[in-house]
Regions:
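Active-site/ligand-binding-proximal alpha/beta "capping" segment
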Residues: 124-135
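Short glycine-rich phosphate-binding loop at a beta-alpha junction
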Residues: 50-58
Length: 136
């Protein structure tokens, strides 16, 4: 994780109000090797817990969560911000205040891919207010 710390220090920019701009390697452009390393690190720290699914919010959490899912050999489910017409009826929905967008977003997950018997590992990009994590 030292590489992530170094990347944040060299390329991240604090914008105030708890917002860290990391779009050069995570939120807009992705440093795939770094996100692979981050996901593997999280997977290794939490392996052995019987995880059956990894859950994240679109979009920024997908890259590290995908790496963790590959490492743990489990499916990755990401909460959508808009319900596509192809999604099953009665999806799980929860509102979350976006720290970076400054508005409330609805996170939506199909019940086809998440059940009460799953052991879910929630992995998102950065923790600012924990509102996304709570919604997930």
């Amino acid at each position: 994780m030292q590489r992530l710390k170094d990347k944040i220090l060299s390329e991240g920019k604090y914008l105030g109000k708890g917002i860290l701009k990391v779009d050069s390697f995570m939120n807009h452009q992705i440093d795939a090797h770094l996100m692979k390393e981050v996901g593997e690190e999280f997977a290794n720290r939490f392996k052995g817990l019987g995880t059956t699914r990894i859950l994240t919010a679109e979009t920024s959490g997908i890259a590290p969560a995908l790496s963790a899912a590959l490492t743990l050999d489990v499916p990755l489910v990401f909460a959508r911000k808009n319900k596509p017409v192809t999604m099953a009826d009665n999806p799980y929905k929860e509102a979350a205040q976006s720290h970076t967008h400054g508005k409330t977003l609805e996170l939506i997950v199909s019940p086809e891919y998440l059940s009460s018997s799953d052991r879910v590992f929630i992995l998102d990009d950065f923790l600012a207010s924990a509102k996304t994590i709570k919604a997930l």
